[in-house]
From Swiss-Prot:
This is DNA-directed RNA polymerase subunit beta. Residues 1077-1091 have a biased composition (Polar residues). In cyanobacteria the RNAP catalytic core is composed of 2 alpha, 1 beta, 1 beta', 1 gamma and 1 omega subunit. When a sigma factor is associated with the core the holoenzyme is formed, which can initiate transcription. It comes from the Bacteria. It comes from Prochlorococcus marinus (strain MIT 9215). Residues 1072-1097 are annotated as: Disordered. CDD domains: RNA_pol_B_RPB2 (cd00653).
Length: 1097
């Protein structure tokens, strides 16, 4: 292919940096969040008020990390920096001040790619979307069908406050979902007089009944109100006025216990039209009175008061790394505060220093817990660059402080009109997490308050103004404007052409003339996420299939020789660049040196900049990370240019699969039910060959009987098995290994008990001490093979950190080349997935008029019912592009260039292709897009013309090699004695309830009995059966399954007298099997069923 890419549509301009969310948030944490926490937390004074400890937050500093990123990965360490902060200890009595810099813990740092390295593994902190703090008004129907209203004040942290009305028009308040309290009691407890309240309300007459109700209950003064409040909130404790005062203060007016946060204050001021200063983060009397006033206006249905929609993105905000980490630091500092107070009280006041008071452990533990085990800290999906990028842009409603899968209703998961341009309506998982895990739209960004914004061009009097920067609007601001979609047709000056434009206004669609439009979106791609925007002709696909297409692109395995798609959308290069998989030069200059491991760029000032390439490293998902230079010595490069291709990249663009020749036709039933028929060319030409790197690890531990040893001298092993081991017993790099081969020889000392009786006898006779060790070597698991790529040895002497009890750790990396084979899963970009059912020799594949055999045959029935017609457009556009020898970029949603534009474009391209010399056969106007193929086996043409073309097809990570599994005899579960399940446990296949019904239906009694007893958990029976098979004897009758005995014992433990009885009423002793058996079987065998009948034949 030549590299001239034809641009069918202008590509999305103004694409932001796609990992911005992560980096900006962590930067905010280092510059503000951490300092904020340290400042809020000081001063700490002891219980007598004599000593005060101040943290001077803005003077904190980070030391250089101990290891760089690569070193941290290699050593299984955390890429982290030590935090030091200046502390000032003031003795109030003597006026003495001690200042000291104190170590307060280690903080993991973000790498340039927006990830963290924790214990050698790359992790990503997923963004969380939660309800924004603020005040929310809702309506509910009571059981008589009357509508009541309520208002909730939700803080960032602290107690909820909920006001509600009832049928008698009384106002109540609940604190943290406790019992209802008359609202006026709370007003009086806060020290407000009746007039204070009434003056603030626009309709005091509604409130009058609440005042009377309070008077009727005899609560006339502030003191009585405080007592009543205490009784309701702390029932069972003796009430007191001072107790009530303190309770009220600590619940709502103490900044340490109650915090609306910056966002909460902003939202409350906005909703209730208040002017409380931004730094007042607790509740004020004004907030409470305005909330009551607003609620009364709702109740009386007076204009200006509106209910809130909690699923609107104006009421949900994103918490990114920085804020999640800040919350965790707060938890750690609160634990630290208790320790400091205790140490102040216990220690000698005169000799105390800040370093003695501050113990870094609680803070370190809190941060470690967050990165190691929080639901939002995830092992990075590194299958390919797109998977990595999408993972960093993921937005989850789950996690601490969020929703749970079980409780999340339909409304939360649904697409909301305010998602437009902010969250992708397509990319979300299938299954229980659908709608709870979303992806950020391509142009969206998160503002300082955590609300998602999306950009627009202003429209002045029907003319789109593209001068300067676009305007970013959050969801609640956008609701007030009339916004036109990004694919509106304009003339060269930017005037909107159509007479009526569909716009979104207040979450509704309406049509307005151009001069009424306020804003227009930047680009049609702005609505969808990065993965979805890589699907060409997306607008012709059903949303369910587009969802599968988006999700499956993330599972594509990087191939040996990646190939850019013939038909792309123009975002491929941006995805590759922002994923961090390709090295980029930061300076203008000339390439002065290139080899496989490094690239050197000399800038205009003569300074050299080194770029080191990754070679054959293992990713988190066992795929291969490898970078190949694409610049030559002497090339002139500009800042931001790609220097090398990463995995699944070609020419600086993302290339997840291969462009292959596809025909849509049935072929001998081999593509029934989405199966795929492929040509042998895919195997021989390594089109879909990928490299996978497996890591095997073994540690030599200290045991009770002495240390384990890594050695070549393994008992009872032939010399040829040790051929590839060095003198230490470790495999050599480059050796080819198969399943069962030794990678690292290890022997473990064995105790007296481990010896068989004959050995003990020999010992007793000869008195000779044999070498008491047993073979415990690391071997290649079943079904695996490959070439040893690297061996790493870690010992305490070298200063490596090893797990407790280990003296030495050896790691062996084995690489395999996996060619495509029957059972592998493949997919296109439009959700058209299938399993390979047969690999045909290329001479048997159907072939084109010019003799080219096709690569893949797909079933045409996969298209109509699934409604993903985009694949057909891609097929034909790819066919035209390959014949024109170019590549095409098609931006989705192309109706702005005219109706039916995709159709016309594809047709024009095909006609253009057929005008090339000798290519007239490429396009047949009578049967557009189809060709008459011939059968490779007979040479006869098929009955009907067939749609043929080039499509981008991916090989997915669900490889048959990782899934195929067989078991003969293996481990059993301890309690039920049934075989374990799963490949990792060497397990069996479950014969479930429905399978039992199937066998019962056919009356296959003996087969069924065998499956439920000797092949599963009849311990005695299975040993006898094995014995009988080995000796060629008939298999004895099965006994009682172990799980049945367990069931009996469980019922007996409930106190039920339960037993098994024969027809004669004699109890059967289920435990008799345990006695050592006599040689004569106590049960009849199959012989007694009369084998003579069979022998006569």
């Amino acid at each position: 292919m030549s590299s001239s890419a034809l641009q069918v549509a202008k590509t999305a301009t103004y694409l932001p940096d796609l990992v911005e969310v992560q980096r900006a948030s962590f930067k905010w944490f280092l510059e503000q969040g951490l300092i904020e926490e340290l400042q809020n937390f000081s001063p700490i004074s002891d219980y007598t008020g004599k000593l005060e400890l101040h943290f001077i937050g803005e003077e904190y500093r980070l030391k250089r990390p101990r290891h760089d990123v690569e070193e941290a990965k290699r050593r299984d360490a955390t890429f982290a920096s030590q935090m030091y902060v200046t502390c000032r200890l003031i003795n109030k009595e003597t006026g003495e001040i001690k200042e000291q810099e104190v170590f307060i813990g280690e903080l993991p740092l973000m790498t340039e790619r927006g990830t963290f390295i924790i214990n050698g593994a790359e992790r990503v902190i997923v963004n969380q979307i939660v309800r924004s703090p603020g005040v929310y008004f809702k309506d509910e129907l009571d059981k008589n069908g009357r509508r009541t209203y309520n208002a909730s004040v939700i803080p960032n942290r602290g107690a909820w406050l909920k006001f509600e009305t009832d049928k008698n028009n009384l106002l109540y308040v609940r604190v943290d979902k406790t019992r209802k309290i008359n609202a006026h009691v709370l007003m009086r407890a806060m020290g407000l007089s009746d007039n204070d309240v009434v003056d603030k309300l626009r309709h005091p007459e509604f409130y009058q009944s609440s005042i009377e109700s309070a008077n009727d209950e005899g609560i006339n003064s502030e003191d009585q109100a405080l007592l009543e409040l205490y009784k309701k909130l702390r029932p069972g404790e003796p009430p007191s006025v001072s107790g009530g005062q303190q309770l009220l203060h600590s619940r709502f007016f103490d900044p340490k216990r109650y915090d609306l946060g910056r966002v909460g204050r902003y939202k409350i001021n906005k909703k209730l039209r208040l002017t409380v200063p931004d730094d007042v983060r607790t509740l004020t009397h004004e907030d409470v009175l305005s909330t009551i006033d607003y609620l009364i206006n709702l109740e009386l249905d007076i204009g200006g008061a509106s209910l809130d929609d909690i699923d609107h993105l104006g009421n949900r905000r994103v918490r990114s790394v920085g804020e999640l980490l800040q919350n965790q630091v707060r938890v750690g500092l609160n634990r630290l505060e208790r320790i400091i107070k205790e140490r102040m009280t216990v220690g000698e006041t005169d000799s105390l220093t800040p370093a003695q008071l501050v113990n870094p452990k609680p803070l370190v533990a809190a941060i470690k817990e967050f990165f190691g085990s929080s639901q939002l800290s995830q092992f990075m999906d590194q299958t390919n660059p797109l998977a990595e990028l999408t993972h960093k842009r993921r937005i989850s409603a789950l996690g601490p402080g969020g929703l749970t899968r079980e409780r999340a209703g339909f409304a939360v998961r649904d697409i909301h009109p305010s998602h437009y341009g902010r969250l992708c309506p397509i990319e979300t998982p299938e299954g229980p997490n659908a709608g709870l895990i979303n992806s950020l739209a391509t142009h969206a960004r998160v503002n300082e308050y955590g609300f998602i914004e999306t950009p627009f061009w202003e429209v002045n009097n029907g003319k789109v103004d593209k001068e300067g920067n676009p305007v970013y609007l959050s969801a609640d601001l956008e609701d007030e404007c009339r916004v036109a979609p990004g694919d509106v047709a304009t003339d060269k000056e930017g005037n909107i052409i159509a007479n009526l434009i569909p716009v979104r206004y207040r979450q509704d669609f309406e049509k307005v003339p151009p001069h009424q439009v306020d804003y227009v979106q930047l680009s049609p791609v702005q609505v969808i996420s990065v993965a979805t925007s890589l699907i060409p002709f997306l607008e012709h696909d059903d949303a369910n299939r587009a969802l599968m297409g988006s999700n499956m692109q993330r599972q594509a395995v990087p191939l040996l020789r990646p190939e850019r798609p013939l038909v792309g959308t123009g975002l491929e290069s941006q995805v590759a660049r922002d994923s961090g998989m390709v090295p980029i030069t930061k300076v203008n200059g000339i390439v002065s040196y290139v080899d496989a491991n490094e690239i050197v760029v000399k800038d205009d000032h003569g300074n050299e900049h080194f770029h080191y390439l990754q070679k054959y490293q293992r990713s988190n998902q066992d795929t291969c990370l490898n970078q190949r230079p694409i610049v030559k010595i002497g090339d002139r490069v500009i800042s931001g240019q790609v220097l090398a291709d990463g995995s699944a990249c070609e020419g600086g663009e993302i290339a997840l699969g291969q462009n292959v020749l596809i025909a849509y036709m049935p072929w001998e039933g081999y593509n029934y039910e989405d199966a795929i028929l492929v040509s042998e060319r895919m195997v021989t030409d390594d089109l879909y060959t990928s490299v996978h790197i497996e890591k095997y690890e073994i540690e030599a531990r200290q045991t009770k009987l002495g240390p384990e040893e890594i050695t070549r001298e393994i008992p009872n092993i032939s010399e040829e098995s040790l051929n590839n081991l060095d003198e230490m017993g470790i495999i050599r790099i480059g050796a080819f290994v198969e399943s069962g081969d030794i990678l690292v020889g290890k022997v473990t000392p064995k105790g007296e008990s481990d010896q068989p009786p004959e050995e003990k006898l020999l010992r007793a006779i000869f008195g000779e001490k044999a070498r008491d060790v047993r073979d415990n070597s690391l071997r290649v698991p079943k079904t695996e093979k490959g070439r040893v790529l690297d061996v790493r040895i870690y010992t305490r002497e070298q200063g490596d950190e090893l797990p407790p009890g280990a003296n030495m750790v050896v790691r062996v990396y084995v690489a395999q080349r996996r060619k495509i084979q029957v059972g592998d899963k493949m997919a296109g970009r439009h959700g058209n997935k299938g399993i390979i059912s047969r690999i045909l020799p290329r001479e048997d594949m159907p072939y084109l008029p010019d003799g080219t055999p096709v690569d893949i045959v797909l079933n045409p029935l996969g298209v109509p019912s699934r409604m993903n017609v985009g694949q057909v457009f891609e097929l034909l556009m790819g066919w035209a592009a390959s014949n024109l020898n170019c590549r095409v970029k098609v931006v989705p949603f192309d109706e702005m260039y005219g109706a039916e534009k995709s159709h016309q474009t594809v047709q024009a391209f095909l006609e253009e292709a057929s005008k090339q010399p000798g290519k007239a056969w490429v396009y047949n106007p009578d049967d557009p897009g189809k060709l008459l193929l011939k059968d490779g086996r007979t040479g006869e043409p098929f009955d009907q013309p067939v749609a043929v073309g080039y499509s981008h097809f991916l090989k997915l990570v669900h490889l048959v090699d990782d899934k195929i599994h067989a078991r003969s005899t293996g481990p059993y579960s301890l309690v039920t004695q049934q075989p374990l399940g799963g490949k990792a446990q060497q397990g069996g296949q479950r014969l479930g309830e429905m399978e039992v019904w199937a066998l019962e239906a056919y009356g296959a009694a003996y087969t069924l009995q065998e499956l439920l007893t000797v092949k599963s958990d009849d311990m005695q029976g299975r040993n006898e059966a094995l014995n009988a098979i080995v000796k060629g004897k008939p298999i004895p009758r099965p006994g009682t399954p172990e799980s049945f005995k367990v069931l009996m014992r469980e019922l007996q433990s409930l106190g039920l007298d339960i037993g098994v009885y024969t027809d004669e009423g004699k109890e059967v002793d289920l435990m008799q099997d345990i006695n050592p058996r006599r040689n004569t079987p106590s049960r009849p065998t199959y012989e007694s069923l009369g084998t003579s009948e069979y022998e006569e034949d």
